[in-house]
Structure formats: structure tokens, C-alpha cells
A protein has these predicted regions:
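Intrinsically disordered, low-complexity, basic-enriched segments
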Residues: 2-73
Length: 73
């Protein structure tokens, strides 16, 4: 099921993105810039491997990731 813009992301997506964000912070990087770079390019090399963040971000719905990033500005 595709998410329409403006819909609230699922709890599992939010939890996954929170875990990814924590892993990026733990590695000493800015979660916003790494997730934004991934979202804009689709290149997973923007995201650290720490805590399996790189593997996990590939599984997140891009609409959920965009929604999360809009809320963190």
C-alpha cells in the first residue's frame, strides 16, 4: 500500500528511522545530512555502516523518510 503525502508514517517505520538516526549519531555524524543525501540520490554510501544503518535505510519507505526529515527541520 503506497502512502500518500501528508499521511502519518507507520510506527514500525518511525522506529526503524529512529534506530538509523541513533546509529548515525553514535558514529559521530549528522543524521539529517546522511539521510537527506540518501533520499536525494538513492546512494546508500551517504549512510554509515555503524549499527547496520546502511542496510536498514534501504528498507524504509522513501515517503516515510521524507516525512521524518521534514519534521526534523
Amino acid at each position: 500500500m503506497r502512502q500518500k503525502e501528508g499521511e502519518i508514517m507507520t510506527k514500525s517505520s518511525k522506529n526503524a528511522i529512529d534506530r538509523i538516526s541513533k546509529s548515525i549519531r553514535d558514529a559521530g555524524y549528522d543524521p539529517y545530512s546522511q539521510m537527506y543525501g540518501f533520499l536525494m540520490t538513492g546512494n546508500d554510501r551517504f549512510v554509515t555502516r555503524t549499527g547496520q544503518a546502511r542496510e536498514r535505510i534501504k528498507l524504509v519507505n522513501p515517503a516515510d523518510l521524507a516525512s521524518y526529515l521534514r519534521r526534523t527541520i
